[in-house]
């Protein structure tokens, strides 16, 4: 029994050949047999020890099967790093097989059908590995590119520019809590009395916000150089690209001080030199900076506002004021000032009130030249209707007398005459819309002359034009549109008188032609109900021949009720070679059908006809077109479209003669159709 137990124990020792294989894998070629035997015994002992400890963990876990976690715990118990990567949710499905005195454990694999593998579609080719580099930082400055975090938003820039400086409390770091006791802390002395701690800000030094140093990288300096040279250069294409870059680039926050200084100094130098072109370019740069949604210019308006106002009220901006158009620069700069006031004026800085005071002071001064007077009025007018109502309208009479004395008096200077004329046009342009809203109609020239002096009649005419334009715009916005479509009609028409009778022709409309749209607009209100002739029937014709246009004579017939006589009025029209579509557009008030059964707008028919080429469509059978549905509203007499060639009002043409066929193709009772006289 002892020998059998010995033999059984000896089977658990690892073979020495395994030690040789491990040694050869490590680069040790020659190893003695005794060394291999000693290593084998040591490794076998360590494995048995770990297995015994793992069994202890298994028994403590009240489990019947040994797991890899038990082996890991045993290794940790021996201060040995555990093995990684051998964990599985289920037990490894090894199968046991024995035969020929040998025991074998193997992994059972599924049988795979080769046809399934062949018919399986190939997987998609994976993308190649590619590397893309971008600048994380350039000399300490982070470029504004999509790969990097976005720069400071506009709201943060506004907060930094408008928030007052805050003093830090002593004993408190920038982001840390108080080191000492708080303001509400109390201390008790030996007598039990409580004493309040001294206030924290008492005698504490103020920590001011450090000055920010705008250091530009080499790339930013190069960008600044290229942008400024392009903005004031002679190439308009480069200037447009540079202004577009300024208006859209999100990474210009660090360059704002340079741009504002460049604009301010550029205006100061070029005003002295009377360089109008460069002043215009600099104002366009200001406009581009203000259009950039990522920039907040609050900290730089103290440099931009004087530069822009200089271009408005400066006495002379160009070398030849009587020839050069410096008035456009003043208007553009005035709009820029209004935009600055709209965006940055608050109750704290009072930008708009200060600018208004400056403009008013220069305008009221009697010695102010006409160029400065023009700029002051333009700047005030661009600030809104309230400023015009409060500051400009009360001084129109005095300004009108000043303008009249220059325009009607002796010629002293051509520059003054041109300036007075521009000031007069500017006042009429900006004051007329305000007066149209303030004063109720009708507009009387005598009343305007009494209130506004010599400018009264001109203002009255401008107000009348403003009212008409506003009414026309409201009419175009509120108009009702009705589009009429119908199938292919066939229509018999009587042509112009020719020698000998003519048989009526059959006219067809092709269906596969690009159709232009014709719009008929009615702007007259519905007339009161009264007896009137039947409604006029308009005929719009187009030719399908290859000729560019064709002239046709159409008979528009009307008849008076009870007269028994009809009159035909020929109308010559020039029509294009494509079929039109008629759109009925009306803004007139529709009268109820019961109140005006026979009015001019009760029934209207609009017929669209296309003529085939010469020699076609003759001798065909006569058929009547399906009636066109009347429009939703009853429009008054319509203004003719481009095809009708004029205006035709209901009841204006004489009644048709007896026996004349009607325009819609219906035949009279007297017999065959007769040619129109």
Curated annotation (Swiss-Prot):
Positions where Phosphoserine occurs in the chain: 264, 626, 634, 636, 653
UniProt region (Disordered), positions on chain: 142-204, 524-574, 611-677
Residues the record lists as Phosphotyrosine modifications: 253
Any GO molecular function: DNA binding
Transmembrane recorded as keyword: no
Tagged with keyword Lipid metabolism: no
Pfam families associated with the record: TAF, TAF6_C
Omega-N-methylarginine: modified positions: 524
Family as reported in the entry's similarity comment: Belongs to the TAF6 family.
Disease / disorder: Alazami-Yuan syndrome: An autosomal recessive syndrome reminiscent of Cornelia de Lange syndrome and characterized by delayed psychomotor development with intellectual disability, hypotonia, microcephaly, short stature, poor speech, and dysmorphic features.
Subunit structure as annotated in this protein's UniProt entry: Component of the TFIID basal transcription factor complex, composed of TATA-box-binding protein TBP, and a number of TBP-associated factors (TAFs), including TAF1, TAF2, TAF3, TAF4, TAF5, TAF6, TAF7, TAF8, TAF9, TAF10, TAF11, TAF12 and TAF13. Interacts directly with TBP, TAF1/TAFII250, TAF9/TAFII31 and TAF12/TAFII20. The TAF6/TAFII70-TAF9/TAFII31 heterodimer forms an octamer complex with the TAF4B/TFII105-TAF12/TFIID20 heterodimer.
Function summary: The TFIID basal transcription factor complex plays a major role in the initiation of RNA polymerase II (Pol II)-dependent transcription. TFIID recognizes and binds promoters with or without a TATA box via its subunit TBP, a TATA-box-binding protein, and promotes assembly of the pre-initiation complex (PIC). The TFIID complex consists of TBP and TBP-associated factors (TAFs), including TAF1, TAF2, TAF3, TAF4, TAF5, TAF6, TAF7, TAF8, TAF9, TAF10, TAF11, TAF12 and TAF13. The TFIID complex structure can be divided into 3 modules TFIID-A, TFIID-B, and TFIID-C.
Protein name: Transcription initiation factor TFIID subunit 6
Taxon lineage: Eukaryota, Metazoa, Chordata, Craniata, Vertebrata
Encoding gene per record: TAF6
């Amino acid at each position: 029994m002892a020998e059998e137990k010995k033999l059984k124990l000896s089977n658990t020792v690892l073979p020495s050949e395994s030690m040789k294989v491990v040694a050869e894998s490590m680069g040790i070629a020659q190893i003695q047999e005794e060394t291999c035997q000693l290593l084998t015994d040591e490794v076998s002992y360590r494995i048995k020890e770990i297995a015994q400890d793992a069994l202890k963990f298994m028994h403590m876990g009240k489990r019947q099967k040994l797991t890899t976690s038990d082996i890991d715990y045993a290794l940790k118990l021996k201060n040995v790093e555990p093995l990684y990567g051998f964990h599985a949710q289920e037990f490894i499905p090894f199968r046991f097989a024995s035969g020929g005195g040998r025991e074998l454990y193997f992994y059972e694999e599924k049988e795979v059908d080769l046809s399934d593998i062949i018919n399986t579609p190939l997987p998609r080719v994976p993308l190649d590995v590619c590397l893309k580099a971008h600048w994380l930082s350039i000399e300490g400055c982070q470029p504004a590119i999509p790969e990097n975090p976005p720069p400071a938003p506009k709201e943060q820039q506004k907060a930094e520019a408008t928030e007052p400086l805050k003093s830090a409390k002593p004993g408190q770091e920038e982001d840390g809590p108080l080191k000492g006791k708080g303001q509400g802390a109390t201390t008790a002395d030996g007598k039990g009395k409580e004493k309040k701690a001294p206030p924290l800000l008492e005698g504490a030094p103020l920590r001011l916000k450090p000055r920010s140093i705008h250091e530009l990288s080499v790339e930013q300096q190069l960008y600044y150089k290229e942008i400024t040279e392009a903005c004031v250069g002679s190439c308009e294409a480069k200037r447009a690209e540079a202004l577009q870059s300024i208006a859209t680039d999100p990474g210009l926050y660090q360059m704002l001080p340079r741009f504002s200084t460049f604009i301010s100094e550029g205006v100061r130098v070029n005003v002295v030199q009377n360089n109008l072109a460069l002043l215009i370019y600099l104002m366009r740069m200001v406009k581009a900076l203000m259009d950039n949604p990522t920039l907040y210019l609050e900290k730089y308006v103290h440099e931009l506002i004087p530069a822009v106002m200089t271009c408005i009220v400066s006495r002379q901006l160009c070398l030849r004021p009587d020839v050069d158009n410096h008035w456009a620069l003043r208007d553009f700069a005035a709009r820029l000032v209004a935009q600055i006031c709209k965006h940055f004026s608050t109750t704290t800085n009072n930008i708009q009130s200060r600018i208004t005071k400056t403009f008013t002071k220069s305008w009221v001064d009697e010695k102010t030249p006409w160029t400065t007077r023009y700029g002051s009025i333009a700047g005030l007018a661009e600030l809104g209707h309230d400023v015009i109502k409060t500051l400009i309208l009360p001084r129109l009479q005095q300004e009108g007398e000043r303008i009249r004395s220059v325009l009607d008096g002796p010629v002293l200077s051509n520059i003054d005459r041109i300036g007075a004329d521009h000031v007069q046009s500017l006042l009429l342009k900006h004051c007329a819309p305000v007066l149209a809203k303030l004063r109720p109609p009708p507009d009387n020239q005598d009343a305007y002359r009494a209130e506004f002096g010599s400018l009264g009649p001109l203002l009255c005419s401008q107000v009348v034009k403003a009212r008409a334009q506003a009414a026309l715009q409201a009419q175009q916005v509120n108009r009702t549109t009705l589009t009429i479509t119908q199938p292919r009609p066939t229509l018999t028409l009587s042509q112009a008188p020719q020698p000998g009778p003519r048989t009526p022709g059959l006219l067809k409309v092709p269906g596969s032609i690009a159709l232009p749209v014709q719009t008929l607009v009615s702007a007259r209100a519905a007339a009161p109900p009264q007896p009137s002739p039947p409604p006029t029937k308009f005929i719009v014709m187009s030719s399908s021949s290859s000729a560019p246009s064709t002239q046709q004579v159409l008979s528009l017939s009307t008849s008076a009720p009870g007269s028994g006589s009809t009159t035909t009025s020929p109308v010559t029209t020039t029509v294009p070679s494509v079929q039109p579509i008629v759109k009925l557009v009306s803004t007139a008030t529709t009268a109820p059908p019961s109140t005006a059964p026979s009015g001019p707008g009760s029934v209207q028919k609009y017929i669209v006809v296309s003529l085939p080429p010469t020699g076609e469509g003759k001798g065909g059978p006569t058929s009547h077109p399906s009636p066109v549905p009347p429009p939703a509203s009853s429009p008054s007499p319509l203004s003719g479209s481009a095809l009708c060639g004029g205006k035709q009002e209901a009841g204006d043409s004489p009644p048709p003669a007896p026996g004349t066929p009607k325009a819609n193709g219906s035949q009279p009772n007297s017999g065959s159709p007769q040619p129109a006289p």
